[in-house]
Every structure is written in structure tokens, then in C-alpha cells.
Amino acid sequence: MNRDDIIFDIHYSHYLEKMFATLTGRIDRIITFIIILSGCGVFVSVTGYFIVGALIAALSICQVVFQFSRASGVAAEHARKYLALITDEPALSNEELLSRFKLLQDSDSEPWGSLKPAAHKRASVVLGRIDNSRALTSKEAFLARLGGDLPV
């Protein structure tokens, strides 16, 4: 693996973690907002208390099971570590760079696969590489936009 490939992989990992952190953070805030808004419906003359209660319960279960806020925090921390490695990269030897990159990869979060093509495109754009990968599907583009980055 040559130095350019390592640098590309570091940038790719940084943008993947950054998008995943943003996406899961936004999902968590949206769910929290809907729970609070639905809870306020109890004080207003709303029919269908059963439906509102079921919605609140379902969203609360989603938050507990999927732990979007925790996933966001872990991914944001990894993105910061990758950014620090990007900053330190010019001063590091190839062996040192590869060693630090492998160390970071060992504790990576598990971002959704739908974000990977967008992260690949973003890393290509940032490094000035020609991107020959396929166009993003509508799902990938939507998730990338919700994740705060839709590379062209």
C-alpha cells in the first residue's frame, strides 16, 4: 500500500465517520422532537390517545435499541481522530502513518453501507482525484444529504 492510498483511506474514513455522526445525531434529534411534540398532544384536545401513546412508545424503543445518540458520539470522536491524523500526516513517515491508521481502524464504529459511496466520492473530491465510481442511488444521496455532505 503506497502513501497516496493510505492518505485516501484516511480521508475516506474521516468523511464516512463524519457523515455517520451527523446522520445519527440528526435522527436522534428528530425522534426526540417527535416524542416531545407527541407528548404535548396529551395536553391538547387530541383524539386517538392510543395512537399517540403507541407512537411515543415505538419511538422511545427505537432510541433505546438503536442508540443513535451514542453512535453519533462514537463516530464524531473517530472523525476527530482521523482529522488529527490528516493534520499530522505530512510530518509522519509511511510506516508511522500506516501504523496510526491501523490503530484507528481497530476501534472504528460501524457506519451504514449506504454512506460509503458518498464518503468515497467526498474523499476523491477533496484529494483532487478523478472519481470513476458509479452515481449515488437516490437512497444513498438522501442519506448523504441528511448526513451533511452530498458530493457531486
Report the location of each language-model feature.
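Cytosol-facing regions at membranes
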Residues: 1-27, 69-152
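Alpha-helical transmembrane segments and their immediate juxtamembrane boundary regions
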Residues: 21-73
